[in-house]
Every structure is written in C-alpha cells, then in structure tokens.
C-alpha cells in the first residue's frame, strides 16, 4: 500500500505531536516531509529515509516521502508498516538532535558502523 504524500504528512504530524516539547528545543527549522526519494550517494541500493541537519540554516529534520514510498512498493507495506517506519525514523532523527545539543555523537557513530557492516555483508 502506498500512502499519498498528504496521508503520510498527516501521520507524521500526529506523531510529531506525541514527542515531548523539550525535544523541539533549538530545532528552529522543525520537521519537514519532502517529496523526493534520496538514494545512498555511494551508489548502494539503499534509501535515505531522513536526516538531521545542523547547518547555516539552523537545526531541522527532513524525512523523504519518496524513499518511504519506494520501500513501501518494494516490500508491500501496510498502513501499520508506514506508521512504524515513519515513527522509527522520526525517533532516530530526534535522537541525533538531542545528542547534538548535548555534544554527543554516539548514534552517528553507531549509524556509520552499521552502514559499514551492511556493505561488507553485501
């Protein structure tokens, strides 16, 4: 099942309201659902589902609808799968944000190690 961009956005809005207000501290760019699919720049058959950004524009979270839709099509997702994947990704990116505020990089390091392990197994 492929949710429309608007349906996915509505789900994401509902989920975002469930997170504590403290998580939004200094997240001046908020959370955006962008239409594109983003593939791994290294050319692997991997999609980037979301990213936490801290740059000249500020701190913000981008989630990529097209990446979710591509996997949903490949894996024949249900609405529950959409909910799980959106929530997991949003939680993951919030963790990057909160760690960043604390000057930590633990999740960033774990992400890199997991990606390296995945590439070795392929």
What spans do the regions from the language model cover?
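Active-site scaffold of zinc-dependent metalloenzymes
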Residues: 44-87, 97-119
């Amino acid at each position: 099942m492929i949710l429309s961009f608007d349906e996915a956005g509505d789900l994401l809005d509902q989920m975002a309201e469930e997170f504590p207000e403290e998580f939004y501290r200094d997240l001046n760019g908020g959370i955006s659902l962008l239409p594109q699919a983003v593939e791994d720049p290294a050319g692997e058959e991997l999609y980037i589902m979301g990213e936490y950004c801290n740059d000249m524009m500020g701190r913000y979270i981008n989630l990529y609808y097209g990446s979710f839709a591509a996997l949903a099509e490949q894996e024949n997702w249900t609405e529950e799968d959409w909910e799980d994947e959106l929530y997991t990704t949003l939680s993951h990116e919030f963790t990057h944000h909160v760690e960043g505020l604390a000057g930590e990089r633990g999740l960033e390091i774990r992400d890199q190690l997991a990606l390296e392990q995945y590439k070795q197994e392929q």
